[in-house]
Regions:
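HDAC/HDAC-like amidohydrolase catalytic core signature
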Residues: 1-108
């Protein structure tokens, strides 16, 4: 069985501030360790039409998410979720990563 890692550089722009479990330093450390495993396949997120997201979420929810990202600084969406200006691209690349992973399993 082959294992793929689907990621993009945008994940390094999802700044959640110091002390948060999704910190950039933690993501960087994990990626560096994974890169030592030569058996892994590295893939980029798939580009997608936002209508795909609307199959699972309402247009109003998608609009709320898109408008939640600050131009500067950090914003808490709830007690656990922190976003920064770089989080928007990271969020949509995460969706593309899921699509790419599913396509990989389905051998597309």
């Amino acid at each position: 069985m082959k294992t793929a890692i689907v990621t993009s550089k945008s994940s390094l722009n999802h700044n959640t501030g110091s002390g948060h479990p999704e910190s950039i330093s933690r993501v960087t450390s994990i990626l560096e360790k994974l890169k030592k495993n030569k058996k892994l396949i590295w893939k980029n997120p798939t580009s997608f039409d936002k209508d795909i997201i609307k199959q699972a979420h309402s247009s109003s929810y998608l609009d709320a998410v898109e408008n939640a990202f600050p131009e500067k600084g950090l914003v808490f969406l709830d007690g656990d979720t922190v976003v920064s200006p770089g989080s928007k691209d990271a969020t949509f690349d995460a969706v593309g990563s899921i699509i790419s992973a599913i396509d990989g399993v389905e051998n597309k």
